[in-house]
Amino acid sequence: VLKNNKGSEDNRVRKLDYSIQISKLFYERFINEEDITLFSPHEVPDLYEAWGTEAFDELYLKAERKISVKKKKISAQELFFDILKERAETGRIYIMNIDHCNTHSSFKDLIRMSNLCQEITLPTDPIQHIDGEGEIALCILSAINVGKIDKRDELEELCDLAVRSCLLYTSDAADEVVS
């Protein structure tokens, strides 16, 4: 609905592409025709932080059992087929197998994200400010992890940082080519 012609203009997002990371646990439940449980990252921040690590499965199962955590159960097959249908209709959803990236990476550090097309899988460290320490491993399309945004004001700041970083990168790259 976000990218295709279904729904109304109010619930479509035409200028945004989607990258979905899927875990080994999801695939296991898909194959076994089981349900998957969906959580808000704000409900289970420890689970969100453990994404892509060995601790994720244990924390996930614990959150599923916890009565006080808001959650929604859905068929893993239904969800995956919906994702594949949207991908087939729009060509704009990219799927990353996060556990596979980490088990087959030549890096000791975790792969937490990728560029949109999923071909750049390098370790990254968060950047809080354009002059701060951190590590970016993306093409110049850039990316913002909206799951980490708590307040609307943060989005504007992150967008500014992303644009500045892209401009700085392309400017530095142009200087190197000219030199």
What are these regions (language model features)?
Residues 93, 100-167:
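Internal glycine-rich alpha/beta core junctions
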Residues 1-109:
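Conserved, charged catalytic cores of large soluble enzymes
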Residues 31, 146, 176:
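Residue-level marker of positions within ordered structural domains that often coincide
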Residues 172-178:
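Single conserved hydrophobic/aromatic residue that forms the stacking wall/gate
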Residues 10-17, 70-74, 84, 129-132, ...:
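Alpha-helix capping and helix-loop boundary segments enriched in small/acidic/polar residues
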